[in-house]
């Protein structure tokens, strides 16, 4: 298995350290956010149009969840231009600051990189490195 630090470019590691410092203090009131949001946990339902299953609730800022929405949209076209448009649109629709949504999306993509290395998934690794670079 590859070492995560050997796989991630120094520029992205440096950016992650900067983002960690920026995100250490929440922006706004603490809300219940979901630590395990992914498309496998969002299902169509009868009582609601969409239902989030298997939640992992934490207290955090609203931009944390917006960051996930940004990250999954950027996966379809991991370019800086597309990422910028997605960040602006998602932040506006979520009523959160765009810089915070971008920062959380970047950090979640870095987490995906770690998982891809651990799971030895080269395609996922390439995708999430591109997403992180687009959001950096």
Residue ranges of model-derived segments:
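An alpha-helical support segment within catalytic cores of ATP-dependent transferases
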Residues: 1-35, 45-47, 92
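ATP/Mg2+ or Mg2+-diphosphate-binding catalytic cores
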Residues: 3, 111-136
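A general structural motif at alpha-helix termini
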Residues: 16-17, 70, 105
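Short, well-ordered beta-to-alpha junction loops that form the rim of enzyme active sites
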Residues: 35-37, 106
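Active-site Asp-x-Gly
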Residues: 44-98, 122, 131
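Hydrophobic alpha-helical segments that form the core
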Residues: 104-111
């Amino acid at each position: 298995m590859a070492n995560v630090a050997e796989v991630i470019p120094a520029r992205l590691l440096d950016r992650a350290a900067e983002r960690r410092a920026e995100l250490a203090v929440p922006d706004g009131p603490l809300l219940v956010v979901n630590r395990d949001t992914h498309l496998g946990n969002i299902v169509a339902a009868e009582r609601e149009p969409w239902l989030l299953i298997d939640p992992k609730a934490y207290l955090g800022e609203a931009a944390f969840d917006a960051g996930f929405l940004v990250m999954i949209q950027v996966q379809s076209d991991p370019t800086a231009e597309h990422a910028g448009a997605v960040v602006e649109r998602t932040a506006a629709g979520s009523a959160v600051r765009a810089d915070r949504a971008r920062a959380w999306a970047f950090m979640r993509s870095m987490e995906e990189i770690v998982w891809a290395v651990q799971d030895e998934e080269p395609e996922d690794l390439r995708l999430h490195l591109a997403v992180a670079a687009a959001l950096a």
